[in-house]
Design a protein with these regions (language model features):
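Extreme N-terminal starter segment of soluble prokaryotic enzymes
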Residues: 1-3
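Core segments of cupin and vicinal oxygen chelate
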Residues: 8-52
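Vicinal oxygen chelate
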Residues: 9-14, 68-112
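Long, continuous compositionally biased terminal/linker segments
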Residues: 38-80
Length: 125
């Protein structure tokens, strides 16, 4: 079981605005910002609902990563709209993905650093 994960960003201001919007749509938010005296002056912020589970760190971004967040169908739709409004780019609008399984309802966007970010619901309609 994964406790937390993270990504790097070359665009800290854009990444913060993007993930603030995305996590608000998923019922969460930015829960922690590591003081810059501990990070060499770089942004390190943690997002989640009850505890930080997704970290965004200002450092050279590597190859794009894929991260999927568990959501309801309504949250998948809200995630996609919020991500697009916050500067994300489309990588698959909300809808069923039967190639994965009959109830796989998801949306995919690229964040400002090109990471493939997904919200997914596995529950039947």
């Amino acid at each position: 079981m994964i406790d937390h994960t993270g990504i790097a960003t070359d665009h800290p201001t854009a990444a913060r605005a993007f993930y603030d919007a995305v996590f608000a749509a998923l019922g969460g938010g930015m829960l922690m910002e590591v003081p810059k005296e501990y990070t060499g002056g770089k942004m390190v912020i943690g997002y989640g609902r009850d505890q930080p589970v997704f970290w965004v760190s200002e450092q050279p971004a590597g190859p794009g990563r894929h991260t999927a967040f568990a959501a309801s169908r309504a949250q998948v739709d809200a995630f996609y709209a919020a991500a697009m409004d916050a500067g994300g780019s489309d990588n698959g609008p909300p809808g069923l993905r039967p190639e994965y399984h009959a109830d796989y309802y998801a949306a995919f966007v690229h964040d400002p650093d090109g990471n493939n970010i997904e919200a997914v619901c596995h529950a039947p309609a």
